[in-house]
């Protein structure tokens, strides 16, 4: 019988980053929370889809809260204490994601809205008729 091969992959080492930047990208269909250190290297991330939501439920505020909570817990395990929050997009999960980051135990020092606003750029999609 053949012997099982040993794993030779690199194990992810625990960083010790006390402060960082949280990017919340909230669209109508999903919310993505990425927490990086001050250099820009990603420490943890989570999305509504990776938190177990599918379809239209990914765009809900509760899904954004769950995603932000998961990302914050992983960042706290890496030693993060303080974050600056950059919010982008028009989605429903913007405020709830910020509250979830705060509720998870991270101290928020700054909240900035970095949503790109066109100077009359592309034509927007047509109105929905339901």
From Swiss-Prot:
InterPro entries named among the record's database cross-references: Ribosomal_uS11 (IPR001971), Ribosomal_uS11_bac-type (IPR019981), Ribosomal_uS11_CS (IPR018102), Ribosomal_uS11_sf (IPR036967)
Single annotated GO MF: rRNA binding
The keyword Ribonucleoprotein belongs to this UniProt entry's keyword annotation: yes
Gene3D superfamilies documented for this protein: Ribosomal protein S11
Example of a GO biological process term: translation
Highest rank taxon of the organism: Bacteria
Keyword rRNA-binding carried by entry: yes
Key words, A-Z: Ribonucleoprotein, Ribosomal protein, RNA-binding, rRNA-binding
CC terms in the record's Gene Ontology section: ribonucleoprotein complex; ribosome
Pfam families: Ribosomal_S11 (PF00411)
Oligomer status and interactors: Part of the 30S ribosomal subunit. Interacts with proteins S7 and S18. Binds to IF-3.
Family from the record: Belongs to the universal ribosomal protein uS11 family.
Function: Located on the platform of the 30S subunit, it bridges several disparate RNA helices of the 16S rRNA. Forms part of the Shine-Dalgarno cleft in the 70S ribosome.
Name by which UniProt lists this protein: Small ribosomal subunit protein uS11
Lineage: Bacteria, Bacillati, Cyanobacteriota, Cyanophyceae, Oscillatoriophycideae
Gene coding for it: rpsK
């Amino acid at each position: 019988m053949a012997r099982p091969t040993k794993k030779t992959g690199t194990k992810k080492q625990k960083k010790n980053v006390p402060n960082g930047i949280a990017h919340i990208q909230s669209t109508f269909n999903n919310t993505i929370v990425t927490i990086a250190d001050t250099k820009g290297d990603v420490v943890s991330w989570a999305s509504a889809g990776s938190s177990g939501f599918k379809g239209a439920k990914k765009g809900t505020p509760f899904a954004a809260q769950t995603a932000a909570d998961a990302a914050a817990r992983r960042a706290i395990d890496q030693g993060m204490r303080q974050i600056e929050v950059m919010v982008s997009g028009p989605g429903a999960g913007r405020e709830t994601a910020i509250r979830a980051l705060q509720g998870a135990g991270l101290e928020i020092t700054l909240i900035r809205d970095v949503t790109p606003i066109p100077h009359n750029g592309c034509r927007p999609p047509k109105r929905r008729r339901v």
